[in-house]
Amino acid sequence: MSKAHVVGLGKSGVAAARLLKREGWEVVLSDRNTSDTLLKQQQELAKEQITVELGYSLDFAGALPDLIVVSPGVPWDIPALVKARELGIETIGEMELAWRHLKSLPWVGITGTNGKTTTTALIAAIFQAAGFDAPACGNIGYAACEVALAATPPDWIIGEMSSYQIESSLTLAPHISIWTTFTPDHLARHKTLENYYDIKAKLLRQSHLQVFNGDDAYLSKIGASHWPDAYWTSVKGKDYLIGDKGFYIEDGWVVEQLQPNSSPQRIVAAEALRMVGAHNLQNLLMAVAAARLADIPPNAIDKAVREFPGVAHRLEHICTWQGIDFINDSKATNYDAAEVGLASVKSPVILIAGGEAKPGDDAAWLAKIQGQTSAVLLIGNAAPAFAQRLQEIGYSNYEIVETMEQAVRRSLDLAKHHQAPVVLLSPACASFDQYPNFEARGDHFRQLCLELVGS
């Protein structure tokens, strides 16, 4: 019996282990961590004849596995995986494993620094409104291998794909791929901007059809010279399209130009989307592009867009208390996303920011803080460094409050004092200093806000 080793006991790792077991592999699933939750998972998976090793880091002292499958959170270049590849052990990511089981189906792959979750969710909603079984998976919704485990295969697979997942997927080739934005992020893992770009570009190069956000500064700069056959989008109108085919906003409508010589066609009114911000119009254009390239009719697109509620943790309206809106933008884990968050809400804002800082250019974000906020509450490891940056630009109305509990309590007082209509959690940071992920951070913010309203 062939032996497989799955690294990482998260949702993706467990789904990969179950899929391999179903296919007849002898499976070991390992995680370097230990906890009561993981011990419980270990016991449950033992009933399925899946061995789980906790507190274990991959080594090659014993019999070598035939296959190693890596969860998205595990760096591709850790010494153990580098050695595995040197030893000739086939090493792939969980997304690649799912692709190998589902490649007979059409995929839409969505990647990008920011905007991919909203775009993925909206594409899935549109395809489902058109009558397709089209689950969102990957970095959102189901693990890709969970979709592969389903008794009945779907019609389409709508996959949000991080750079981590693309890096470990060697043959993944969606029918349609979308690149939402590109700015410095995850450089601690990918080292250089060029390497980060090349990883994401691989997904698009291996796809049949490509869609790009033409309003993104970096993507538009490399534009048609790199991607001459792609479809481009622009919220600014037809004159701003790169190339001669794509999707754009004109007179309040999403308009398609599928071929250079075809007549432009109105697809859906831009106001049908309830989500605020120019960035969400960009997301709308890319979602409509995917739908039209899959021959979905405008009436299904219109229905889905009008009913689309938005995405948790991305400018999510939690509640209104004494005329103050509390908004959860926990998914803003870098400066660009946080800048967009500030630009998308009413001002002046009481901003809650901080966490585990990432490399990047903070100048535009700081300028937005100066123009849009009445006060800034700083939490997490980044608080002292952020305070220093605010001092350097002459902004003094900040407080280091350290925890989310203190930030939410203090935000109400400050909002009343400054007559600010919005309290916004938009951290510009990863969450790992205080929370396991940005979802847990956003959930905690939501809980605290609702407790405040109920008190």
Curated annotation (Swiss-Prot):
Transmembrane segments: none
Primary location recorded for the protein, binned into one broad class: cytoplasm
Enzyme Commission no: 6.3.2.9
Native source organism of the sequence: Trichormus variabilis (strain ATCC 29413 / PCC 7937) (Anabaena variabilis)
Pathway(s) served: Cell wall biogenesis; peptidoglycan biosynthesis
Locations listed in the record: Cytoplasm
Keywords annotated in UniProt: ATP-binding, Cell cycle, Cell division, Cell shape, Cell wall biogenesis/degradation, Cytoplasm, Ligase, Nucleotide-binding, Peptidoglycan synthesis
Function: Cell wall formation. Catalyzes the addition of glutamate to the nucleotide precursor UDP-N-acetylmuramoyl-L-alanine (UMA).
Ligand binding (ATP): 112-118
GO MF annotation list: ATP binding; UDP-N-acetylmuramoylalanine-D-glutamate ligase activity
Gene field: murD
Family: Belongs to the MurCDEF family.
Catalytic activity annotation: UDP-N-acetyl-alpha-D-muramoyl-L-alanine + D-glutamate + ATP = UDP-N-acetyl-alpha-D-muramoyl-L-alanyl-D-glutamate + ADP + phosphate + H(+)
A Pfam short name: MurD-like_N
Record-given protein name: UDP-N-acetylmuramoylalanine--D-glutamate ligase
GO biological process: cell division; cell wall organization; peptidoglycan biosynthetic process; regulation of cell shape
Disulfide cross-links: none
GO annotations of cellular component type: cytoplasm
